C-alpha cells in the first residue's frame, strides 16, 4: 500500500505540455496523479495486490481503491461531519473509506479519542493520524489503550465478514460503508439519517457524538441484536441509549448470518477455519446467504439459512468442517448436511 497525499490543489493559470484546458484538467489531474502511482504498484506487486491510499479523488478513482476524508478537526461536530462526508463519498461510488481517528487538526481530549476509536475501527479502513502530536493511545490515558485494543480485536474477528463484503463490493459496486436509505429505500425514516450507517449487509453502526455517551439512532423493522452487549432491540422506531467507551450501537440486522473469525490478533488468517456463524432473528420464510473468502478473494465457504416454522435451517458448503453456530434469538438452528 502506498499513500498519496494532495493531488487536488491544481492551479488554473498553468500551461499543460499537451495543450489541455487547465479548467477541464482540475478534476482529471487528480485521477492521473493517483493512477500513475497505482500503475507502478501493479507492476511491482501484481494486478490484484496493488493498493493506493489516497486523499484526492474524482469520478473513476474508486478503482485505486482506498481513500480517506482529509483534514478533520478534533471535536465532535467535525467527527459528525466526517461521517456525513463518508456517506456522500459512498453514494458517489466509492467502496472503501477511512478518516483520521481523533481528528487531524488539534489534539483530541481522551474522551473524544476513545469515541472516535470505536467509530474508526468500525470503518472499512482504520488509521490513527494527526498533526502536531502523536495519536498513540498511551499518550491519552490507560483506558484509551484498552478501548483501542478491544475494537482492534473486534475488527480482526469481523474480518471474514468484512473481507467478504469487500469482495462483494468489488464485484457489484455496492459500497461497504453506506447510508441507511440504500438498504432500506421503502423506509422513509432512513432518508435523511446521517449519524449512522450500514457496515456491509448485516451490521448497523451508530457512532457516539456526545461526551455523556448518549446516542439516538433509528432501527428499521425487525428484531436487532447489539453485537457487543448482546441486547435485543425491537426495530421500527428510534432508540435512545447511553454507552460507556467499551460499546456503541453495533447492531446485527434481522434475517442475516454474521461470520466471526477465530483470530483477534491479526487481520489476515484462514477466515473459514474455526469461524463462528451468528444467526440473527429470522422472519417466517426469510432466507439469507453469506460467503466467506480466502485471502485471494475466492469463496471457500458458503452458508445459507431459511426459517421454517420454529426452526432455522442452515446449510454449509465448503470449508473444513471446523465451525460453530450460535442463534442470537434462541430459535433452534438445524444444520443440514
Provide a role label for each language-model segment.
Residues 38-44, 49-50, 57-68, 81-85, ...:
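Catalytic core of carbohydrate-active enzymes
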Residues 21-34, 68-88, 200:
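Acidic, His- and aromatic-enriched active-site or binding-groove loops in soluble protein domains
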